[in-house]
Swiss-Prot record:
It holds the Pfam family Conotoxin. This is Glacontryphan-M. GO terms for molecular function: calcium channel regulator activity; ion channel inhibitor activity; metal ion binding; toxin activity. It comes from Conus marmoreus. PROSITE patterns: CONTRYPHAN (PS60027). Its main location: secreted. Ca(2+) binds at residues 53, 55. It comes from the Eukaryota.
Amino acid sequence: MGKLTILVLVAAVLLSTQVMVQGDRDQPADRNAVPRDDNPGRARRKRMKVLNESECPWHPWCG
């Protein structure tokens, strides 16, 4: 019985992975969507630059 449970779980994981990889094709609403940010770390780097340029009360963390 334990092997059957593991087999069912593995099959479910493989099926869900296949759905995530293939997706649901190009839907009409997707074409009008706002483009995603290709550089998500940009805002974080800007904040760190401001912290580094300003007087920082936490010297060990500000670099």
